[in-house]
A protein has these predicted regions:
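Internal, hydrophobic cores of structured domains that mediate oligomerization or house catalytic pockets
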Residues: 1-117
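C-terminal interaction module
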Residues: 101-304
Length: 305
């Protein structure tokens, strides 16, 4: 349905019966079977399923890579504002492959190909898929940005236990004990290992994975299913899925080397001001309450209170 003919999200939310799940997707694609750079999707369970613990509601939004360069700080600010506005359990942001909303399974082979080609920093699997929405006591993966509610922060050992150097990691508090962690100044798919060699995981992601390992899922339902006649490789077995979940896990001596490699990458300090300014605007536009006090490591760059 064309954008100008589609009902507004607010109308959908208020007109959908309480016992009915709400599923809506808006994309910049020019055809329902095509893929767009921009996407905004909502999956909300009906009241009965929600009260009987049948999974999590999901919000997905995507922008092209160029958006991060042309609108510095906007994406991080929007992600943070959404975390402050909604009762989130967990969330993450980074590189991914947009697939046609109406043809996910038929295009999963392309998602798998790009993830193998460009590196482990590429997310795989439908954010609104069964294996993801059923995760509550664990997270699927680390990424450029990770959001955790208070329960997950405690399960990870507490915010103070995260030994993440502030020059390369933003730690933005939100809500009643929640935490957003940004790993590095920009998302990464991989680090080159040289001609003819598989790409290596980004050091910032490896170290964040090690810090959050207690709450990262070790098992999940399959991340991809494909079609009945598909012969392309996919993450459509539990073994392949579990291997993907551990793609950032390295031997202890290799983790030590990642600390040295991290120090060769750009720091986050100069990017914080743009995020803070945009976040302030979003809070006003969305009517959000006053933010929690600064911890000195967030986007505001202030001193702990």
């Amino acid at each position: 349905m064309a954008y100008e003919k589609a009902p507004a999200f607010e109308r959908l939310a208020t007109s959908t019966p309480g016992d009915t799940s709400l599923v809506a997707t808006m994309t910049s694609a020019d055809h329902k079977l095509a893929t767009g750079f921009y996407e905004f999707s909502v999956f909300a369970l009906g009241e009965w399923k929600a009260t009987h613990n049948r999974g999590l509601d999901t919000l997905v939004f995507t922008v092209p890579r160029a958006f991060l360069e042309q609108r510095p700080g906007k994406f991080q600010a929007l992600f943070t504002a959404m975390c402050e506005a909604l009762p989130i359990v967990h969330g993450h942001a980074g590189y991914g492959v947009n697939l046609p909303p109406m043809e996910l399974n038929a295009n999963e082979a392309s998602e798998y190909f790009y993830a193998r080609r460009y590196g482990p920093g590429i997310d795989v699997g439908d954010p609104m898929g069964y294996s993801t929405v059923m995760l509550e006591g664990a997270i699927k993966t680390v990424d450029w940005i990770v959001a955790l509610n208070a329960d997950l922060v405690r399960a990870a050992g507490g915010a103070d236990s995260l030994t993440l150097p502030p020059d390369w990691y933003v730690r933005q508090p939100f809500g009643d004990g929640g935490l957003i962690v940004q790993a590095g100044v920009a998302p990464q798919a991989s680090v080159s290992a040289g001609p003819g060699k598989p790409p290596l995981p980004p050091p910032a992601y490896v170290l964040l994975d090690a810090a959050l390992r207690p709450i990262i899922a070790e098992k999940m339902d399959i991340l991809q299913s494909g079609t009945l006649d598909s012969t392309a490789p996919l993450l459509n077995t539990t073994i392949a899925t579990e291997a993907w979940l551990k793609r950032f896990v390295l031997e202890p001596d290799q983790v030590t080397e990642q600390w040295r490699e991290l120090h060769k990458t750009p720091t986050v300090g100069s990017s914080k001001a743009a995020v803070a300014a945009n976040l302030s605007q979003f809070r006003k536009i969305m009517g959000l309450p006053e933010p929690v006090p600064s911890n000195g490591f967030g986007y505001d760059g202030g001193s702990p209170s």
